[in-house]
């Protein structure tokens, strides 16, 4: 079973909600002081996990490199904000797949993905939502924002998108159970996604309908550009472990971009498939 540590921010109501949900019915086993973090070890329903408070805003948590030396996977528990205030439960890899880094991290640097863990979390979010009849969208988000790559696979799990939802105990429990599911996920086929909007609807549908398909990085339409496509492609493929296929939603991608993607895929000995093929 993997050693998974959850980073939560005491100043973030959704993050606090998720952390409290995780520990409510869990047994505390141990506490360990590291240089920057105090890590608690808990067990719930036979699943062991580790929990520690962040030093500040999660998207700026560059000290997480210390955790990467000790744990297999880092999960960032966070709120999600949007202009539409849409109720949502989301997972995504952090990173900046463009030359801009407005919200933490470094330009054209992404974190190492955890496709299997994210897929297990996504499926559990949907299962719990459907079972409880919750009014939330469940989806991947595309790769965006910091922190810098800590050196271990990581992902964000988020509750959106306003104060009422951030403190919703059912949403907190959904995320808690999703994190537990990600501790020991089943084998998957890791892929990289290109195209689509911020909430990656076509890629999410493909992952939910194809049990083996598990996305790492997803690069949306608005983050693709000829000027840096080669560097971006290398970064997201290299940091999606064991990815052998690139899944493309090309409905709004320039034909020239798709042709360049085909060349890059061929040069790496990978396979390019349309998202509609894999659903």
Swiss-Prot record:
Cofactor mode of binding and number, as noted: Binds 2 Zn(2+) ions per subunit.
Presence of the UniProt keyword Metal-binding in the record: yes
Protein origin, superkingdom: Archaea
GO BP annotations listed: D-amino acid catabolic process
Keyword annotations of the record: Hydrolase, Metal-binding, Zinc
Pfam families in the cross-refs: tRNA_deacylase
GO molecular function list: D-aminoacyl-tRNA deacylase activity; zinc ion binding
Catalytic reaction equation(s): a D-aminoacyl-tRNA + H2O = a tRNA + a D-alpha-amino acid + H(+); glycyl-tRNA(Ala) + H2O = tRNA(Ala) + glycine + H(+)
InterPro entries hit by this protein: Deacylase_DtdA_archaea, DtdA
Region (Disordered): 86-106
Main enzyme class: hydrolase
EC number per UniProt: 3.1.1.96
Cofactor(s) the protein needs: Zn(2+)
Annotated family: Belongs to the DtdA deacylase family.
Physiological role: D-aminoacyl-tRNA deacylase with broad substrate specificity. By recycling D-aminoacyl-tRNA to D-amino acids and free tRNA molecules, this enzyme counteracts the toxicity associated with the formation of D-aminoacyl-tRNA entities in vivo.
Quaternary context: Monomer.
The protein, known as: D-aminoacyl-tRNA deacylase
Originating organism: Methanopyrus kandleri (strain AV19 / DSM 6324 / JCM 9639 / NBRC 100938)
Gene encoding the protein: dtdA
């Amino acid at each position: 079973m993997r050693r998974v540590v959850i980073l939560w921010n005491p100043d973030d109501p959704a993050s606090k909600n998720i952390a409290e949900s995780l520990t409510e019915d869990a047994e505390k086993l141990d506490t360990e002081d590291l240089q920057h973090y105090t890590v608690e070890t808990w067990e719930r329903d036979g699943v062991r996990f580790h929990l520690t408070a962040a030093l500040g805003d999660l998207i700026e948590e560059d000290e997480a490199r210390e955790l990467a030396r000790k744990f297999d996977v880092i999960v960032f528990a966070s709120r999600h904000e949007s202009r539409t205030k849409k109720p949502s439960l989301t997972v995504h890899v952090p990173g900046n797949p463009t030359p801009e880094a407005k919200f933490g991290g470094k330009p054209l640097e992404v974190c190492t993905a955890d496709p299997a863990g994210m897929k297990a979390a996504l499926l559990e979010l949907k299962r719990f939502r459907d079972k409880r009849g919750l009014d939330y969208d469940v989806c991947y988000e595309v790769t965006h924002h910091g922190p810098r790559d800590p050196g271990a696979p990581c992902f964000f799990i988020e509750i959106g998108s306003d104060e009422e939802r951030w403190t919703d105990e059912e949403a907190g429990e959904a995320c808690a159970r999703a994190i537990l599911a990600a501790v020991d996920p089943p084998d998957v086929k890791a892929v990289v996604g290109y195209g689509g909007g911020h909430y990656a609807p076509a890629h999410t549908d493909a992952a939910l309908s194809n049990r083996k398909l598990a996305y790492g990085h997803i690069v949306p339409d608005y983050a693709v550009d000829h000027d840096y496509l080669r560097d971006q492609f290398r970064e997201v493929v290299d940091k999606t472990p064991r990815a052998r296929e690139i899944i493309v939603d090309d409905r709004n991608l320039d034909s020239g971009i798709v042709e360049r993607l085909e060349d890059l895929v061929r040069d790496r000995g990978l396979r390019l498939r349309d998202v509609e093929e894999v659903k």
